[in-house]
Regions:
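Non-catalytic, well-ordered alpha-helical scaffold segments
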Residues: 5, 138, 189, 225-230, ...
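Signature of N6-adenine DNA methyltransferases within the class I
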Residues: 1-127, 210-214, 222-225, 247-255
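Segments forming glycine/polar-rich beta-alpha architectures that bind adenosine-containing cofactors
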Residues: 67-207
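Basic, amphipathic alpha-helical recognition segments used for DNA target recognition
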Residues: 183, 195-257, 264-268, 272, ...
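Alpha-helix capping and helix-loop boundary segments enriched in small/acidic/polar residues
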Residues: 1-2, 245-249, 262, 288-291
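Short, well-ordered loop/turn and helix-capping segments at boundaries between secondary-structure elements
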Residues: 13-19, 234-238, 260, 277-280, ...
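Short, well-ordered beta-strand micro-motif
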Residues: 12-14, 145, 191-194, 216-218, ...
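Non-catalytic DNA-recognition/assembly elements of restriction-modification systems
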Residues: 71-95, 119-120, 262-309
């Protein structure tokens, strides 16, 4: 069985209660560029990396996951006392039950919008009420959905979800819809696309409903929102996420497991100042400036996480 969008395969394993199986060697190869390389794993290849683990060591990992890095780093990751899930609520978002009926795009140029209706601009409202827009027959609010081309802040609102009171009442009762984690709708948080890319692009959410294709991160200490936004855009977190989760998705559970390091006061102030600068920039025209400030943040996080790098 394979999944075309992510080039994954399913391997069936046989369970064995014999203690001797714990001495099995498990080899994991990464870095494949072509399908043909699958048949050449015994040959020397510049692309391929091989990690070898005892089955007994894998059983010691949290949730028995494969952590693809050297053993010293595995110990540090497994022994992390504080994780993202300890300092933030990490949740998935809303599902209408029928996106083609209830979700609209700003224009046909939006990625993935070909089969969606275009929103009527006269029916867009600034409503942040969980019970819906009152006294209108049909109304829409801005909706965070899918990936972002930019870090820190999205270029524009590309998607809208129907949010008049009658429709919200329908979502709550409908068996197909998922009005899940609704206490976080319209709150200030961080959006990370569920589908993994080479580089995480985390963006700030304010006064928005967010889709189930988004993992929302909501720091428990409100003064850490900018710090967490910068952290999730860092090379360190991008690397760690790929280490602990080599699959195609950034699920909420994997993000919760990421090691968290508490910043000192000066470090927090510096990161906050840098993020304020970025948020004041134009995400379309100031790309190089944003990347330069983000690189300053990267250097700070590299020091904070230097024992794992």
């Amino acid at each position: 069985m394979n999944f075309g969008y992510s080039n994954l395969s399913i391997i069936t394993l046989e369970k064995d209660d014999c203690e001797s199986v714990k001495d099995n060697d498990v080899k994991i190869f990464t870095g494949f560029k072509t399908v043909r390389e699958l048949g050449r794993i015994d040959e020397n290849s510049e692309n391929l990396q091989c990690f070898c683990y005892k089955q007994s060591d894998i059983l010691k990992n949290e949730n028995y996951k494969f952590i693809i890095t050297d053993n010293s780093k595995i110990a540090i990751i497994n022994d992390s006392k504080v994780r993202i899930g300890d300092v933030a609520d990490v949740v998935t978002g809303f599902y209408s039950g029928n996106n083609k009926e209830f979700i609209c795009a700003k224009s046909k140029e939006i990625k993935g919008a070909q089969n969606y209706r275009m929103v009527d601009c006269d029916k867009i409202y600034d409503c942040y009420d969980l019970t819906g827009i009152k006294n209108v027959a049909e109304g829409y609010v801005a909706y965070v959905k899918g990936s972002s081309d930019t870090r820190y802040i999205r270029k524009e609102d590309e998607w809208y979800v129907r949010w008049d009171k009658e429709t919200v009442d329908f979502y709550i009762k409908d068996k197909k819809a998922r009005f899940q984690n609704s206490k976080f709708y319209f709150k200030t948080g961080i959006a990370i696309p569920m589908v993994k890319s080479k580089q995480i692009k985390a963006t700030l959410m304010r006064n928005r409903v967010f889709d189930q294709s988004i993992v929302g991160i909501f720091p428990k200490e409100k003064n850490k929102i900018y710090y967490m936004l910068a952290l999730m855009n860092s090379n360190v977190i991008n690397k760690l996420l790929h280490i602990i989760n080599p699959t195609a998705n950034n699920s909420a559970n994997y993000i919760k497991q990421l090691p968290y390091r508490e910043p000192g006061y000066e470090m927090l102030m510096k990161i906050n100042s840098n993020v304020v600068k970025i948020l004041d920039m134009n995400p379309e025209t100031d790309i190089d400036k944003i990347e330069a400030v983000n690189e300053e943040n990267n250097k700070i996080f590299d020091l904070l996480y230097q024992d794992i790098l």
